[in-house]
């Protein structure tokens, strides 16, 4: 069966010359990995196997553990007899999946955790996707209609923050204030017993050709073993296509992800957590950049709209002139 990428079509038999083309410096890691595992599959199965590898490395929203198991089992089915033993589900625990080379060295792996993180490790490159809080098929996710979690006394925390006139002014007029709020909010969280404070840099892209994505910052801290996000200027996006972000947010880490995911289906949102606010501000500054040249290593995806998946397929397509 042909492998469709964009408007192209990859024949089942992949020529050596075409494979050589993927050795460019900007070759995505999964394509480099493919060179190491393509001999596991006969020529008539290579296209389907390559499509499966691409899906493993770029999981669609709503992917579950069962989907991952199914994809690795498909690869085992497509592989030559003997080589299927190099494709593992549950080698180091039920949420660990990997493909090994002939020397039993890891080529590619996927690790799942209990909070919906799906981490792909591939040729020294790591990319994390935040998929869903529901890990079992048929479990529906709940829309987060509230802004303040009930797990902690978030309402009281917000009111106390507002007692500071400088912080209150920024909360009341949130546009462009998120960076300057990081330090006072983190100080407040420290005073309230939160530890492992991190500074979350966030990019929001409307389209792949956007010159300057929207940047945003929030503060993350841990209390009694659970992460919480203080995003007290989130409501600056209420009139920018994300109407349910209608107030300051103090939510658990999972609730925060769900809140943003429910806010938009067409924007690309990803983040990185830093131990230092200055590093966060520099890494996620509001300067021109190209999505095409952005490294996704170490970033956690909150949303992955269809246009982004199309963009990645076009960018990483093997289709070209022979």
UniProtKB/Swiss-Prot annotation:
What cellular-component terms does GO give this entry?
extracellular region; host cell cytoplasm
Q: Which domain of life is it from?
A: Bacteria
Q: Does the keyword Secreted apply?
A: yes
List UniProt keywords, sorted A-Z: Host cytoplasm, Secreted, Virulence
List where this protein forms a coiled coil. Answer: none
Q: S-adenosyl-L-methionine among the record's keywords?
A: no
Annotated consequence of substituting residue 178 to A: Loss of activity. No change in IQGAP1 binding
Q: Where in the cell is it found?
A: Secreted; Host cytoplasm
Q: What is its main location?
A: secreted
Q: Which InterPro entries match?
A: Tox-PLDMTX_dom (IPR028907)
The protein's assembly and partners: Interacts with host IQGAP1 and host TRIP6 (thyroid receptor-interacting protein 6).
Q: What does this protein do?
A: Effector proteins function to alter host cell physiology and promote bacterial survival in host tissues. This protein is required to maintain a long-term chronic systemic infection in mice. It inhibits normal cell migration of primary macrophages and dendritic cells, by a mechanism that involves interaction with the host factor IQGAP1, an important regulator of the cytoskeleton and cell migration. Also accelerates the systemic spread of infection from the gastrointestinal tract to the bloodstream, probably by interacting with host TRIP6.
Stated name of the protein:
Secreted effector protein SseI
Species of provenance: Salmonella typhimurium (strain LT2 / SGSC1412 / ATCC 700720)
Q: What is the lineage of its organism?
A: Bacteria, Pseudomonadati, Pseudomonadota, Gammaproteobacteria, Enterobacterales
């Amino acid at each position: 069966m042909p492998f469709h990428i964009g408007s192209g079509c990859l024949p089942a038999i992949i020529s050596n010359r075409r494979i050589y083309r993927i050795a460019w410096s900007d070759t995505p890691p999964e394509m480099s990995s493919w060179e190491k595992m393509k001999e596991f599959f006969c020529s008539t199965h290579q296209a389907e196997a390559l499509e499966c590898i691409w899906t493993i490395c770029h999981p669609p929203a709503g992917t579950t553990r069962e989907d991952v198991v199914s994809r690795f089992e498909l690869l085992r089915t497509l592989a030559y007899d003997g080589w299927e033993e190099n494709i593992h589900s549950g080698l180091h625990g039920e949420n660990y999946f990997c493909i090994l080379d002939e020397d039993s060295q890891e080529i590619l792996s996927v690790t799942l955790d209990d909070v919906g993180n799906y981490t792909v490790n591939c040729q020294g490159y790591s990319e994390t996707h935040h998929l869903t809080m529901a890990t079992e098929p048929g479990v529906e996710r709940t829309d987060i209609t509230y802004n303040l979690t009930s797990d902690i006394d978030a309402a009281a925390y917000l009111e106390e923050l507002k007692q500071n006139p400088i912080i209150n002014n920024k909360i009341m007029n949130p546009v462009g204030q998120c960076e300057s709020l990081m330090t006072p909010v983190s100080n407040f969280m420290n005073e309230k017993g939160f530890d492992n404070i991190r500074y979350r840099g966030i990019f929001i892209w409307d389209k792949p050709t956007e010159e300057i994505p929207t940047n945003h910052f929030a503060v993350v801290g841990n209390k009694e073993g659970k992460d919480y996000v203080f995003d007290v200027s989130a409501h600056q996006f209420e009139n920018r296509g994300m109407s349910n972000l209608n107030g300051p947010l103090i939510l658990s880490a999972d609730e925060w992800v769900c809140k943003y995911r429910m806010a938009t289906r067409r924007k690309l949102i990803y983040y990185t957590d830093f131990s230092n606010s200055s590093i966060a501000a520099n890494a996620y500054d509001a300067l021109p950049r190209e999505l095409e040249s952005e490294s996704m290593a170490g970033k956690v995806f909150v949303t992955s709209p269809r246009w982004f998946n199309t963009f990645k397929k076009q960018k990483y397509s093997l289709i070209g002139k022979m």
